[in-house]
Amino acid sequence: MSTTDTIVAQATPPGRGGVGILRVSGRAASEVAHAVLGKLPKPRYADYLPFKDVDGSTLDQGIALYFPGPNSFTGEDVLELQGHGGPVILDLLLKRILALPGLRIARPGEFSERAFLNDKLDLAQAEAIADLIDASSEQAARSAVNSLQGAFSARIHQLVEALTHLRIYVEAAIDFPDEEIDFLSDGKIEGQLNGVMADLEQVRTEARQGSLLREGMKVVIAGRPNAGKSSLLNALAGREAAIVTDIAGTTRDVLREHIHINGMPLHIIDTAGLREANDEVERIGIERAWNEIEQADRVLFMVDGTTTDATEPAAIWPEFMARLPATLPITVVRNKADITGETLGLTEVNGHSLIRLSARTGEGIDLLRDHLKQSMGFTSNTEGGFLARRRHLQALETAARHLIQGHEQLVSAYAGELLAEELRLAQQSLSEITGEFSSDDLLGRIFSSFCIGK
């Protein structure tokens, strides 16, 4: 579809409400105003007017706002009609506007896409709009606002600017090799490069926090039947989310709960007890359990403390450990401490975390919550922080890798040309975050995930 078309969409959620808003953006916005309102409202002033049908009858009455480009959200002429929020009324008004020449329904995210294409905001800021709408906690919402206001973009621009200056210095050393001073070996370039690498690592740390706020942590509770997995889910969720009985195999499917630990979203997944299945339904549940385990950020390996004294996962259940991905973090949860009399607490055993608790009484649950938060490196104090997406983390990781490779070329061989190329690639990766260097395919995937009307 053409980006020169005039687009229209409902900007408020579907359904009934006190107010319903239609947004129009494009060169024909003023013509829509004349057709529906009978005049062009004074720019940036609220005007209370009737909204007219083609035969002159009144469809609704409400507030009209006109923002001529480039001083608008999209950078184009924008008209907003704020009427009553009944779906029938809004549908009639939408049909009236679409009947005008040159108008079409906006694609999901197309208003934000046009704002990006018209340099009203960069790609990270555009993504922050969707993140603000989807925020699941106050902390996530505040961080999304910071991103929308350019906090994340400013950090990226600082890195790009530093790389630009460094590239200029390196290129000068390459272009003027006969100068008396060997710029590549005098220590200045390495010092500047080390500074950029340190700054990038700080941004990566903050971005990981922002990603946790947005994406959350996926924790899977796994173990044998009747180990107390569902009781642990209920204890973490603070409600009776799962049925708990003494009958082994009560949980036959995957159960999901979404909670927050001091602002960090946590996706808890309770799974069917792992054993040889007795029937087809249980077999399917166990296979789903393994699928969830393989995609987890951390596994809580639930152990009935009354059945074994072992604390090493391989000693408790070697077959289970053999099937787990080698890099998947595990916390062994020895349950039923209220029965065994074990001392509550968290320890490290041969590289694995071990916690003793009672899911039934709730003793030790706060220790587990703190452990989960700390295991992901999450800090509650993110004042001035920003949200980050997985693609942002990947771009930052790629940039860091190129800088490391460039540093190796510098200190081992004083290879200026190779260093310059690594700096260019690092700069390119960072520019993908703000959209200064992005493929059309990437932009399409990002904006298609937005709401219609945004």
Swiss-Prot record:
Q: Which residues form the TrmE-type G domain?
A: 216-377
Extract one GO BP annotation from the record.
Answer: tRNA wobble uridine modification
Family annotation (Gene3D superfamilies) = P-loop containing nucleotide triphosphate hydrolases, Probable tRNA modification gtpase trme, domain 1, tRNA modification GTPase MnmE domain 2
Task: Kindly list the positions annotated as binding K(+).
Answer: N226, T245, I247, T250
The compartments listed are: Cytoplasm
Q: Which GO terms describe its molecular function?
A: GTP binding; GTPase activity; metal ion binding
Where it mainly occurs, coarsely classed, is cytoplasm
Gene Ontology cellular component terms for the protein in this record: cytosol
Report the cofactor remark.
Binds 1 potassium ion per subunit.
* Binding-site list for (6S)-5-formyl-5,6,7,8-tetrahydrofolate: R23, E80, K120, K454
Please list the residues that bind Mg(2+).
S230, T251
Q: Which domain of life is it from?
A: Bacteria
* Protein purpose: Exhibits a very high intrinsic GTPase hydrolysis rate. Involved in the addition of a carboxymethylaminomethyl (cmnm) group at the wobble position (U34) of certain tRNAs, forming tRNA-cmnm(5)s(2)U34.
Kindly give the PANTHER family that the UniProt entry links to this protein: TRNA MODIFICATION GTPASE GTPBP3, TRNA MODIFICATION GTPASE GTPBP3, MITOCHONDRIAL
Give the record's subunit note: Homodimer. Heterotetramer of two MnmE and two MnmG subunits.
Protein's recorded name: tRNA modification GTPase MnmE
